[in-house]
């Protein structure tokens, strides 16, 4: 097996992985292709920490961690963090940056389904940010996340709604007009309506706790959380207690 390529595994889109492999070296460039992720990370981290009752001392899994932006920030909060991704280059970047920063994060190249088969009910918090729209079977990812969290634990998802507004803002606006992310980053057909995501959640031990929109104002060039899930949104769920 070539370690530099994503192995042939269930629920892996190699074209999607290749997109992020190509720009992995610039993952921590605050003015590069991943600038929006750096900009919204404090909002994500704050939401996750607040809804989880803090992260200190908790065992956390970040599914689709990429270059480690969220994973590192959760480790800085005192969590014991594992990051999963199928991209070899992003994980190499994540490991190097963590080493340079003196932050301890375990990074693993495997699918969430594989990880769930070996680590069921081992995490206090599971995060899956902007990953569902990049895999062939997002429903399978939701089910695996539910298997990984401890009874009473928290699982967070973020993705993009599928409608005309999200296409205009996330694809036309962000990729072609504002050039906030590389062209071809998103495929509107892979976006997920909140009702679809909630239906998959309902098939598991998870229960919806809260949903919020993530909004960008191009005039003020700022991001904020708030009502309205027309474009980007985050969902907080909790596993039933045993």
Swiss-Prot record:
Top-level taxon of the source organism: Bacteria
This enzyme catalyses: a 3-demethylubiquinol + S-adenosyl-L-methionine = a ubiquinol + S-adenosyl-L-homocysteine + H(+); a 3-(all-trans-polyprenyl)benzene-1,2-diol + S-adenosyl-L-methionine = a 2-methoxy-6-(all-trans-polyprenyl)phenol + S-adenosyl-L-homocysteine + H(+)
Q: Biological process GO terms, please?
A: methylation
Q: What does this protein do?
A: O-methyltransferase that catalyzes the 2 O-methylation steps in the ubiquinone biosynthetic pathway.
* EC number from the UniProt entry: 2.1.1.222, 2.1.1.64
Q: Which Gene3D superfamilies does the protein's record reference?
A: Vaccinia Virus protein VP39
Per UniProt, what is one Pfam family of this protein?
Answer: Methyltransf_23
**Coiled-coil blocks:** none
**Which residues are noted in the entry as S-adenosyl-L-methionine-binding?**
44, 64, 85, 129
Please identify the protein, giving its name as recorded.
Ubiquinone biosynthesis O-methyltransferase
Output the SUPFAM superfamilies linked to this UniProt entry: S-adenosyl-L-methionine-dependent methyltransferases
Q: Does the keyword Methyltransferase apply?
A: yes
In which family does this protein belong, per the annotation?
Belongs to the methyltransferase superfamily. UbiG/COQ3 family.
Keyword Methyltransferase belongs to the record: yes
This entry's Gene Ontology molecular function terms read: 2-polyprenyl-6-hydroxyphenol methylase activity; 3-demethylubiquinol 3-O-methyltransferase activity; polyprenyldihydroxybenzoate methyltransferase activity
Query: Main EC class of this protein?
Result: transferase
| Matching PANTHER family | METHYLTRANSFERASE, UBIQUINONE BIOSYNTHESIS O-METHYLTRANSFERASE, MITOCHONDRIAL
- What InterPro entries does the record tag this protein with? SAM-dependent_MTases_sf (IPR029063), UbiG_MeTrfase (IPR010233)
Source species: Salmonella arizonae (strain ATCC BAA-731 / CDC346-86 / RSK2980)
Query: Where is the organism placed in the taxonomic lineage, from the top?
Result: Bacteria, Pseudomonadati, Pseudomonadota, Gammaproteobacteria, Enterobacterales
Do you know which CDD domains this protein is assigned to? AdoMet_MTases
Q: In which pathway does it act?
A: Cofactor biosynthesis; ubiquinone biosynthesis
Q: Which UniProt keywords apply?
A: Methyltransferase, S-adenosyl-L-methionine, Transferase, Ubiquinone biosynthesis
């Amino acid at each position: 097996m070539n370690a530099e390529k994503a192995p042939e595994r269930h629920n892996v889109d190699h074209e999607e992985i290749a997109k992020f492999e190509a720009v992995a070296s610039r993952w921590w460039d605050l003015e590069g292709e991943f600038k929006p992720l750096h900009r919204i990370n404090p909002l994500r981290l704050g939401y996750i920490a607040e809804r989880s009752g803090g992260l200190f001392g908790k065992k956390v899994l970040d599914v689709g961690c990429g270059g480690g932006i969220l994973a590192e920030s959760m480790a800085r909060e005192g969590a014991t963090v594992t990051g999963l991704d199928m991209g070899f280059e992003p994980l190499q970047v994540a490991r190097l940056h963590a080493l340079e920063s003196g932050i301890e994060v375990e990074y693993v190249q495997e699918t969430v389904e594989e990880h769930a088969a070996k680590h069921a009910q081992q995490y206090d918090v599971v995060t899956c940010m902007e990953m569902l729209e990049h895999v062939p079977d997002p429903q399978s990812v939701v089910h695996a996340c539910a298997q990984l969290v401890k009874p009473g634990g928290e699982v967070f998802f973020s993705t993009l709604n599928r409608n005309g507004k999200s296409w205009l803002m996330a694809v036309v606006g962000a990729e072609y007009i504002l050039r906030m992310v590389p062209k071809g980053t998103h495929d509107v057909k892979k976006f997920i309506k909140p009702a679809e995501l909630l239906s998959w959640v309902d098939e598991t031990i998870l229960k919806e706790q809260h949903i919020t929109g993530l909004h960008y104002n191009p005039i003020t060039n700022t991001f904020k959380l708030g009502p309205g899930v027309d474009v980007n949104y985050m969902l907080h769920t909790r596993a039933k207690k045993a």
